[in-house]
Amino acid sequence: MSSAPPVPAIDIVSGIWTEEALAHRPGWQEQFFAGKMKSKTNMKGVTLDDQLALMAEAGIERALLFAPKAGRRGLPGSFHLPYEVVARALEKYPGRFYGLAGLDPYEGMSGVRALEDAVKHMGFIGAHLYPHWFDLPPDHAKYYPFYAKCCELGVPIQMQ
């Protein structure tokens, strides 16, 4: 009886934990993640090389890195990770990391144009949405321009 080789996994929602990415997150995060992960070491950042090593150890071949937009800009506790942070990881490790562009329904058409730019010029393959961070159901009209743009671009939206 022969055994098949292991099937490599794809992490479909992976955060980017570089020092640069963590600098964009709010101050409450360390307390929030305490006890859930190795917060003392991970909250200082994980290099992309270390992230790839951890992925290899877990049998993960590829990861979808998302650039979260969590809550309206300027509200306490909210944060937006610039697409450029994820784009640099995609450029450095093509074929290992793929990008998902976070959506903020309150950005309107400027957000739609930023999504299009991320897909057409930064190598992103889809969009990511946290509906609960915006207190809007996924079928709210504020999302329609983003949905239409994703259809036009032929990319999926991941809702979490």
Please give the residue ranges for each predicted region.
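Active-site gating/metal-coordination segments in enzymes
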Residues: 61-62, 69-160
